[in-house]
A protein has these predicted regions:
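Tandem repeat scaffolds
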Residues: 1-87
Length: 87
């Protein structure tokens, strides 16, 4: 359970964080390149500058997380834009 954790600038490259509770966490400038985030809860997470390129996370909960301020693949950006639109 990493709910509310301060993960600023941390590296989670290739980490398996499936079903992880990351809600309310501070992920600013963290690196999640090719991490597995499917079915994770990232509700309300701060993602300014977070590197999400190559992740698996389409089926995670992104509600109230500012995913649009993160670096990510275009395919993920398109999928998230449909399900979790920017307010």
């Amino acid at each position: 359970d990493l709910s509310g954790a301060d993960m600023r600038g941390a590296s989670f490259k290739h980490a398996n964080l499936m079903k992880a509770a990351l809600d309310g966490s501070d992920m600013r400038d963290a690196r999640f390149v090719k991490a597995k985030l499917s079915l994770s809860n990232m509700q309300g997470a701060k993602m300014d500058g977070t590197d999400l390129r190559g992740i698996r996370g389409r089926y995670a909960i992104w509600r109230d997380a500012n995913w649009w301020d993160a670096k990510m693949d275009d395919s993920l950006r398109k999928a998230l834009g449909k399900k979790w639109p920017k307010p």
